[in-house]
Amino acid sequence: MAKSLLFGEQARRSMEAGVDKLADTVRVTLGPKGRNVVLDKKFGSPLITNDGVTIAREIELEDPYENMGAQLVKEVATKTNDVAGDGTTTATLLAQAIIREGLKNVTAGANPIQIRTGIRKAVEKAVEEIKVISKPVNGKEDIARVAAISAASEEVGKLIADAMERVGNDGVITVEESKSMGTDLEVVEGMQFDRGYVSAYMVTDTEKMEAVLDDVYILITDKKISNIQEILPILEQIVQQGKKLLIISEDIEGEALSTLVLNKLRGTFTCVGVKAPGFGDRRKEMLQDIAILTGGEVISEELGRDLKDVTIDMLGTADSVKVTKENTTIVNGKGDKVAIKERVSQIRVQIEDTTSEFDKEKLQERLAKLAGGVAVIRVGAATETELKEEKLRIEDALAATKAAVEEGIVPGGGTAYIDIIPKIADLTSDIIDVKLGIDIIRKALEEPVRQIANNAGAEGSVIIEKVKATEAGVGYDALNDKYVDMLKTGIVDPTKVTRSALQNAASIASTFLTTEAAVADIPEKENTPPMAPGMGMDGMY
């Protein structure tokens, strides 16, 4: 395919136009008085959102050079979302500001490589200073504040704080759509996995269609059980003790299933069978997790164990097990606490070592089931459009809260960026172009406050000067149009979000400035086939 080429200033300006189109679309959403953007969808109703990365992902421009610029800034938003889960609008805004100021200097004859050196130097210093002013998150109140600022809702803030308090730092919190109008929180205590009973005849409560087993033995195996003779010895031992049994296996079928159901219906013996969770190697690991949690052993051919040789001490135990059509929950497994801690540490190491986001997510779920718990925030709304918008806001707030717990919080509303400007201004260099790069970051750090003020109908430049004149930590409360101590008022941003937004914006923008040529495909023209003879309108009456 043939290519079109642009060089120097023309290439940079064409790409900058794309950067501006994307960033100008996203920037209107920043701050407590930011607006929403409507995204057209091929199927279903349009999506209304103020989530920067969601908006950025939808933007594809017709001009190939403009599109290149837009895609580069889209990467800033995506990377920030991957690392911190929030701050994508701020990152986009910073990238635009660095590119705009940088191109002015490059056009005036400055060396882009030296400018990039200055930008990197300034960002390193900025990140250092952000960490210095960072404060750790203390308790439920701080968590609620972070979530409330991100979601622009105090109710959501309280909900997320409740969820984090109940499942702990190792817990997993998921956001799902609710069938009702309200938004509520459901916390699953104990270990839950998505497998239900193999036969409805095994239920103990026919009204709720669930089986609840108290003080229960748990047989864990990766084998398929079809012959009752295989498990008869262990069944006889359990019957003698008058206990109940949960069997977790690859499957229960044939004679084994019918015998267990028959004994349950006769009232001789209560046993519930469920299929093992997961697939392949992940299944083996999950069965081992259950075994450690309950103090049992996995009966597996790989380990040279046979079902006929199972004894009572190989079984797991738990205070209670609840089995529904779709889920099994094990509460208060009687496993050895030291063994559980060792398993948790092992999973943490695997989380740090893995590069796959999917694997990391699955490992985090396993960790939560062993060490914390699982909370589900069910989001409800009157219409599907409102539901999607609400869900995106809660997901952002949840990510921001987790980031805050990890690295702490700084004054919000762009105040942290303003507070570190004097430290950036102190940086010097003998090379003029490096000094220009430092100045570019110094100016760019004003941009978030300017945009928050503009979106609130105030004059950005005036607000910036007033914030600079106040003591550190005091910023502009755009919602109430006044200057307040941001930390005391609860207007805070996660340190991780503030830091990664600047780092990612500077990384892409400084590389953008070094562009000297751009190459794009020339779209091929579609050759319309000639009209066949007689297909015209001539001769018709």
From Swiss-Prot:
ATP binds at residues 29-32, 86-90, 413, 477-479, 493. It is found in: Cytoplasm. Keywords: ATP-binding, Chaperone, Cytoplasm, Isomerase, Nucleotide-binding. GO terms for biological process: chaperone cofactor-dependent protein refolding; protein refolding; response to heat. One of its GO terms (cellular component) is GroEL-GroES complex. InterPro entries: Chaperonin_Cpn60_CS, Cpn60/GroEL, Cpn60/GroEL/TCP-1, GroEL-like_apical_dom_sf, GROEL-like_equatorial_sf, TCP-1-like_intermed_sf. Its EC number is 5.6.1.7. The keyword Isomerase applies. GO terms for molecular function: ATP binding; ATP-dependent protein folding chaperone; isomerase activity; unfolded protein binding. The keyword Chaperone applies. CDD domains: GroEL. It catalyses: ATP + H2O + a folded polypeptide = ADP + phosphate + an unfolded polypeptide. Gene3D superfamilies: GroEL (3.50.7.10), GroEL-like equatorial domain (1.10.560.10), TCP-1-like chaperonin intermediate domain (3.30.260.10). Belongs to the chaperonin (HSP60) family. Forms a cylinder of 14 subunits composed of two heptameric rings stacked back-to-back. Interacts with the co-chaperonin GroES. Together with its co-chaperonin GroES, plays an essential role in assisting protein folding. The GroEL-GroES system forms a nano-cage that allows encapsulation of the non-native substrate proteins and provides a physical environment optimized to promote and accelerate protein folding. This is Chaperonin GroEL. The lineage of its organism: Bacteria, Bacillati, Bacillota, Clostridia, Eubacteriales. The gene is groEL.
